[in-house]
């Protein structure tokens, strides 16, 4: 009974939610054996035919290449591509590739020479003697990738599995309508497929190996059972036909009952899955030593006269394959790469066959029905019932249209396998898969931008930290340099410290007084005499500077004399043209007379104290005398022209006379108390004498021109007489000085 339950559990099949049963349409192409296609004249090999980065070019334009020769180097996750035939590299340029928009990607263009010569092939028939790492490296360098549609590098996938893989699943379901490439491969090459499975099992060492195949492939099932008749390590599981049973998560659940977690991988639950075509490519790479240069492609559709499965070289233009199969295009003919549910329409037929190309569908005008217009969602939930990933396609549709990326991510849009079951059952003809693909692309772009921003932020923070460290180190160096003096500074500091210590030692020495000895104050006396000498030198220098400032400039003296003569002429002319009725203020005249007397006394004192060796310029003296005479005449004329009726306030006159006498006495006292060594500037004295003489002449002239009826003020007459006497004394003294 226990064995019965174990056997039942061993062959148990689980079922997933959702799924659809579309028309299979497989009988068009699975009835004919695999055949070869004649070589094309030109091959276009894109450098990137897999998930990941493209490899590094190792050929140049004009190089001769052989079939199987690497065109790129595979490093890390970069998968190399190989020449599909022998020929010459004519160009390395962007070319449209297998993409819904036919995006241009860098490609190697080879013109075939028709010989189809291989590179030397080194097969490992005894692969069991090779290590796991050697086998994985060979698979990777021979360009083997997942041929079921994803294109993930097989070597990287095997390396990532490690020792935690318990179940190896070979996907032979091939659930999508029209496609029969794996079915025909298992019918014609079942033994090679099983041998490739054994190589994978040798690398992974799983606990069990399962082959999942749908029950709509009876010939393939028979061939596999015949090959596995004597094997107990590989189990063949036949599952019901249901789309999409060939999905990785769906087939894993069907065969093991385990579900891949959201955002996780099948290896997280100890399961690794490979496609039938991938197992065949592994066998050819390891045992035969042949890189992947061709694959099985289904050519089907009512627009093709000879549908079937062919060995298509990678890089062969699609047009060449269709023409070889008898392609009869209609007016609005479409060609789909892949199946009707997960494939995409080609913009033109010059795109090449790549590693993930498994079918070329050329339907007639009415084979897939007329395209219908998209309508509004009616919330019928048919898409949710058909979704094999247990998602809510109608909600994802609204989130995608509304650009609500966060909500779409929260509703697990990344788990969508883009099987097209929701779009197939939608009564509103909404292309849901297209919306989901676009939303995934936008989310991926946003995440890529966030990643770049995070990297830029990390670089900025690292730079700021580096600058802070450099600044701190620089400040520390400056601080150390300031604290630690240089060698010469150390010597100077040491010398200063030595002097200080010596002085301190001298200061602490006791003063000893001996009888009969006198103290030695010579150093102090010498220092005092030096300070006195320095002070006398500074005073002498200052005195010389002051004496130099008093030296008369002969040019300046001549200029001043000329100015005085000009002023005297101008004054005489003004006096001659003066109107007789012009009145002179007697108070102002009295003040001017007193000032003139004071100046005269001061000038006499200065001339008496002047040094006899000092010479006075006679021209300058003559100028000053003329000016004095002119001023005197002007004053006399003003007094003579004064109106007789003008009365002078005796009190004001007395005050003015008292002020004049006080100023005169003060001036005489200052002159008497002056030091005998004080020297009077002879130029200034001569100028003042000339001014006095001019005033005297001016006063005389004014008195002469006065009208006879005018009365003369006796006080003014007395002032004028005093001025005249002072001027006469001054003139006599100047004459004596000039004669000396």
Swiss-Prot record:
Cofactor binding, note field: Binds 2 [4Fe-4S] clusters per subunit.
Positions of the 4Fe-4S ferredoxin-type domain: 369-397, 407-436
Chief location of this protein within or outside the cell: membrane
Annotated Basic and acidic residues bias: 611-621
GO CC terms, sorted: plasma membrane
MF annotations from Gene Ontology: 4 iron, 4 sulfur cluster binding; electron transfer activity; metal ion binding
Segments of this protein annotated with the region Disordered: 602-621, 660-718
Binding site for [4Fe-4S] cluster 1: 377, 380, 383, 426
Enzyme class: translocase
Gene3D superfamilies, sorted: 3.30.70.20, NADH-ubiquinone oxidoreductase 51kDa subunit
Keyword Translocase (UniProt): yes
InterPro entries, A to Z: 4Fe4S_Fe-S-bd (IPR017896), 4Fe4S_Fe_S_CS (IPR017900), Ion_transpt_RnfC/RsxC (IPR010208), Nuo51_FMN-bd (IPR011538), Nuo51_FMN-bd_sf (IPR037225), RnfC_N (IPR026902), Soluble_ligand-bd (IPR019554)
Known cofactor(s): [4Fe-4S] cluster
Gene Ontology BP terms: electron transport chain
Residues that hold [4Fe-4S] cluster 2 according to the record: 387, 416, 419, 422
PROSITE patterns cross-referenced by the UniProt entry: 4FE4S_FER_1, 4FE4S_FER_2
EC number of this enzyme: 7.-.-.-
Pfam families linked: Complex1_51K, Fer4_7, RnfC_N, SLBB
Family note: Belongs to the 4Fe4S bacterial-type ferredoxin family. RnfC subfamily.
Protein purpose: Part of a membrane-bound complex that couples electron transfer with translocation of ions across the membrane. Required to maintain the reduced state of SoxR.
Subunit architecture: The complex is composed of six subunits: RsxA, RsxB, RsxC, RsxD, RsxE and RsxG.
Name the UniProt record assigns to this protein: Ion-translocating oxidoreductase complex subunit C
Organism in which the protein naturally occurs: Escherichia coli O9:H4 (strain HS)
Gene that specifies this protein: rsxC
């Amino acid at each position: 009974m226990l064995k019965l339950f174990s056997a039942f559990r061993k062959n148990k099949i689980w079922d997933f939610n959702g799924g659809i049963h579309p028309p299979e349409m497989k009988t068009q192409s699975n009835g004919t054996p695999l055949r070869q296609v004649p070589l094309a004249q030109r091959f276009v090999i894109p450098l990137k035919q897999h998930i990941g980065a493209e490899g590094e070019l190792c050929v140049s334009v004009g190089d001769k290449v052989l079939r199987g020769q690497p065109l790129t180097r595979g490093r890390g996750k970069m998968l190399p591509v190989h020449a599909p035939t022998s020929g010459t590299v004519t160009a390395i340029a962007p070319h449209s590739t297998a993409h819904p928009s036919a995006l241009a990607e860098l490609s190697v263009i080879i013109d075939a020479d028709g010989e189809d010569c291989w590179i030397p092939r080194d097969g490992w028939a005894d692969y069991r003697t090779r290590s796991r790492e050697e086998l994985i490296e060979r698979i990777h360098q021979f360009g083997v990738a997942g041929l079921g549609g994803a294109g993930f590098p097989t070597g990287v996938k095997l390396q990532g599995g490690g020792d935690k893989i318990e179940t190896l699943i070979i996907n032979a379901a091939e659930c999508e309508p029209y496609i029969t490439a794996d079915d025909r491969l298992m019918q014609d090459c079942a033994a090679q497929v099983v041998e490739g499975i054994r190589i994978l099992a040798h690398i992974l060492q799983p606990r069990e190996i399962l082959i999942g195949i749908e029950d709509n492939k009876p010939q393939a099932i028979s061939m596999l059972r015949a090959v596995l008749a004597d094997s107990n390590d590989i189990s063949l599981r036949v599952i019901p036909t249901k789309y999409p049973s060939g999905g990785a998560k769906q087939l894993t659940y069907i065969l093991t009952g385990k579900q891949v977690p959201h955002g996780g991988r099948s290896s997280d639950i100890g399961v690794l899955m490979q496609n039938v075509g991938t197992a065949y490519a592994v066998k050819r790479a390891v045992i035969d030593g042949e890189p992947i240069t061709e694959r099985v492609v289904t050519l089907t559709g009512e627009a093709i006269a000879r549908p079937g499965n062919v060995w298509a070289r990678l890089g062969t233009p699609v047009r060449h394959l269709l023409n070889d199969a008898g392609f009869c295009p209609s007016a609005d003919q479409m060609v789909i790469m892949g199946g009707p549910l997960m494939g995409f329409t080609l913009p033109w037929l010059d795109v090449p066959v790549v590693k993930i190309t498994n079918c070329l569908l050329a339907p007639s005008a009415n084979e897939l029905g007329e395209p219908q217009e998209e309508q509004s969602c009616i919330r019928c939930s048919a898409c949710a019932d058909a979704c094999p990933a247990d998602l809510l396609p109608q909600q994802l549709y609204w989130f995608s249209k509304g650009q609500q990326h966060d909500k779409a991510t929260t509703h697990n849009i990344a788990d969508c396998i883009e099987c097209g079951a929701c779009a197939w059952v939608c009564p509103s003809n909404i292309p849901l898969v297209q919306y989901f693909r676009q939303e995934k692309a936008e989310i991926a772009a946003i995440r890529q931008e966030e990643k770049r921003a995070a990297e830029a932020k990390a670089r900025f923070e690292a730079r700021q930290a580096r600058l802070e460290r450099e600044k701190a180190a620089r400040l520390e160096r400056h601080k150390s340099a300031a604290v630690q003096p240089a060698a010469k500074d150390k010597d100077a500091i040491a010398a200063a410290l030595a002097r200080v210590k010596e002085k301190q030692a001298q200061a602490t020495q006791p003063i000893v007084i001996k009888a009969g000895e006198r103290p030695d104050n010579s150093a102090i006396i010498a220092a005092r005499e030096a300070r006195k000498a320095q002070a006398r030198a500074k005073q002498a220098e200052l005195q010389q500077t002051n004496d130099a400032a008093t030296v008369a400039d002969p040019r300046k003296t001549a200029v001043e004399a000329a100015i005085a003569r000009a002023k005297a002429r101008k004054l005489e002319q003004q006096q001659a043209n003066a109107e007789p009725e012009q009145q002179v203020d007697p108070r102002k005249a009295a003040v001017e007379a007193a000032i003139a007397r004071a100046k005269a006394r001061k000038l006499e004192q200065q001339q008496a104290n002047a040094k006899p060796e000092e010479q006075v310029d006679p021209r300058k003296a003559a100028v000053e005398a003329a000016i004095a005479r002119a001023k005197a005449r002007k004053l006399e004329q003003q007094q003579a022209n004064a109106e007789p009726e003008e009365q002078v306030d005796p009190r004001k006159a007395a005050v003015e006379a008292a002020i004049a006498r006080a100023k005169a006495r003060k001036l005489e006292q200052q002159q008497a108390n002056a030091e005998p060594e004080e020297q009077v500037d002879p130029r200034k004295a001569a100028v003042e004498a000339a001014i006095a003489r001019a005033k005297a002449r001016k006063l005389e002239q004014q008195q002469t021109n006065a009208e006879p009826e005018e009365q003369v003020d006796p006080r003014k007459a007395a002032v004028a007489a005093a001025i005249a006497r002072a001027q006469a004394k001054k003139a006599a003294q100047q004459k004596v000085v000039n004669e000396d």
